[in-house]
Amino acid sequence: MTLFLRIFTFGCLLLLAGCTTTQPQRDQVNWQKERTRLEQLSHWQLSGKMAIITVQQKGSARVNWQQNGDDYRLNLTSLIGTHILELSRSNGEITLIDNEGNPHQSQDAEALIYQLTGWNIPVQGLPEWIKGLPGKAEFELNPDSSLASVRDGQWQIVYGDYRDQDGYRLPHLLTMTGQGSRLKLQINQWTLAR
C-alpha cells in the first residue's frame, strides 16, 4: 500500500506542477548593448534620499543631482529643507557651497566634502554608478543582465529596485560601503534629457 501511495502522490505532484502557470521572465538584456546605451546617457537628473552612517555619526539628506556631460550639480538638503551643501563641477572647476553660503574650491570633491561634513561620499564614481555602470571596476550581473554589484577600490556598491524609465532600466536603490561609511541612496525620480 505504501508503494501505491508514493506513486499516487508523485503522480498528483506531477499533475499539479503541469497545471501551474509560470511568470513570464523579463527578456535578457544584452549587457554590452545596454552598457553602451547607458554610457551615452550623459544628461540626466535625479532626486531622492540618502542615509549616511559613519562610526562617528548618522545622517540623512534629500538629494538632487543634475548631470550635464562631465559637469554636475549635487544639492543636499536636510529632510526639513535646510541647505547642507551644494557641490558643482563646471569646466573642471569644483565648488562647494557650505550650509552658511560660503564657497570652497578644490580639485578633489571627495576630500572637500569630507573636510566640511565628515562624510565620505564617492563623488568621482557616482555619475556612472548611479546609472548602473561599473566604470573600470569589477562587477557582477543579475540574471537579467542588470548590474548587481560593483567593487571599485575601497567602495562596494550593491544595486536594487531596477525600474524602466524612458527606455532605460535604471536602479532606484544603491547601497555603498567603504572608507568607514555606509551610504544608502533611494532614488525617487529620474528625469532623462532627450
Curated annotation (Swiss-Prot):
S-diacylglycerol cysteine-type lipidated residues: C19
Signal sequence, renumbered to the chain: 1-18
SUPFAM superfamilies, per database record: Prokaryotic lipoproteins and lipoprotein localization factors
Lipidation (N-palmitoyl cysteine): C19
Annotated localization: Cell outer membrane
Gene Ontology annotations for the cellular component aspect, listed alphabetically: cell outer membrane
Cross-referenced InterPro entries: LolA/LolB/LppX, OM_lipoprot_LolB
GO annotation, biological process: lipoprotein localization to outer membrane; protein transport
Membrane topology: Lipid-anchor
Keywords, ordered alphabetically: Cell outer membrane, Chaperone, Lipoprotein, Membrane, Palmitate, Protein transport, Signal, Transport
CDD domains listed in its UniProt record: LolB
Family: Belongs to the LolB family.
Binding partners and assembly: Monomer.
HAMAP family noted in UniProt: LolB
Known function: Plays a critical role in the incorporation of lipoproteins in the outer membrane after they are released by the LolA protein.
Record protein name field: Outer-membrane lipoprotein LolB
Species of origin: Aeromonas salmonicida (strain A449)
